[in-house]
């Protein structure tokens, strides 16, 4: 059976000890995959996916971002990155984990997987650190609808001025997530947009480390990140030869029900990326790794990874 090893490393912010996990296979290591998780969640939720890949010869590593999971030092810190430049701190922490893991497994291909906010962080990462990756999987991503993001960033700035960057803002939370259930029939909870699997939704709601309201500071950081990854001059810094696999559900509001994911995919092609694939799952919602057809999703990811080794 695969085995888990938990460890910590010093964050780029010089203050926090970032919590991380490594899942290793019993036998030969064929490749490494690093996971960047989404907003208001943590890496323990990825344990089944990590085990699945480890059973197929992958070392899988992941860390709780600043303000998330076991990296957050208290409840107030949940969904807060830093007083200043938090987005870049989180991306730099991803790079630290990459370097630590690549040094440990120097002779095998290295992949990066990012989901939701982690997809935006991953898209930032491949701009700022384009080297050393055999491929990238981008899950549950979205597009930058310019004026909306600019307005959200301004609102977050005003909230920071009025209440401070660590303020957990109901206004920003509603702006970000308030409309996500609107297209579904028979809505049971406010988080039905995550997945059709009710047990997963209930576990998320019951988890004290999941579902924290976004702080003004983190929301401001994330809007800045969305602006950064949409600029042509930044996209041109990517290694165009790195394979990229976009995957999402066509019932995911974060990706505008597949339409925004298609636009990001097309933007990568227009930028000159040579190996880009898009997979949309019918009726799938935001967390395809936790959907009713997750076995199919796992198998598709593995098939793509294997094709790039």
Identify the meaning behind each predicted range.
Residues 1-27:
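N-terminal cap/lid segment of alpha/beta-hydrolase-fold proteins
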Residues 33, 37-41, 116-117, 250-251:
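Active-site glycine-rich loops that stabilize anionic/oxyanionic intermediates
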Residues 271, 275-309:
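Catalytic active-site module of serine/aspartate enzymes centered on a nucleophile-bearing elbow/loop
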Residues 105-116:
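Alpha/beta-hydrolase fold nucleophile elbow
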Residues 122-209:
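Alpha/beta-hydrolase-fold enzymes
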Residues 82-103:
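Alpha/beta-hydrolase active-site loop
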Residues 45-76:
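Conserved alpha/beta-hydrolase
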Residues 246-248:
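Short beta-strand/loop motif that positions the catalytic acidic residue
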């Amino acid at each position: 059976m695969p085995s888990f090893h938990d460890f910590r490393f010093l964050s780029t912010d010089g203050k926090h000890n970032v919590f991380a996990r490594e899942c290793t296979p019993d036998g030969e290591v064929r490749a490494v995959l690093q996971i960047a998780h989404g907003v208001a969640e943590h890496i323990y939720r990825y344990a089944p996916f990590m085990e699945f890949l480890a059973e197929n010869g992958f070392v899988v590593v992941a860390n709780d971002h600043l303000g998330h999971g076991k990296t957050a030092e208290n409840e107030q810190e949940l969904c807060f990155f830093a007083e200043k430049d938090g987005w870049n701190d989180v991306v730099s922490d991803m790079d630290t984990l990459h370097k630590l893991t690549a040094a440990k497994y120097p002779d095998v291909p290295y992949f990066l997987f990012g989901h939701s906010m982690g997809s935006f962080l991953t898209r930032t990462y491949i701009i700022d650190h384009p080297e050393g990756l055999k491929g990238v999987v981008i899950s549950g991503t979205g597009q930058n609808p310019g004026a909306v993001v600019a307005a959200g960033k301004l609102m977050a700035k005003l909230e920071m001025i009025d209440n401070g960057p660590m303020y957990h803002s109901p206004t920003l939370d509603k702006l970000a997530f308030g409309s996500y259930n609107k297209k579904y029939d028979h809505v049971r909870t406010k988080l039905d947009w995550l997945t059709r699997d009710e047990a997963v939704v209930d576990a998320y709601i019951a988890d004290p480390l999941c579902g924290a309201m976004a702080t003004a500071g983190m929301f401001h950081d994330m809007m800045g990140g969305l602006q950064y990854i949409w600029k042509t001059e930044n996209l041109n810094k990517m290694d165009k030869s790195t394979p990229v696999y976009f995957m999402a559900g066509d019932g995911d509001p974060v990706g505008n029900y597949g339409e925004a994911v298609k636009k990001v995919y097309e933007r990568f092609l227009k930028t000159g990326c040579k190996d880009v694939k898009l997979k949309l799952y019918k009726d799938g919602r935001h967390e395809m790794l936790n959907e009713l057809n997750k076995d199919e999703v796992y198998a598709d990811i593995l098939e793509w990874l294997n094709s790039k080794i």
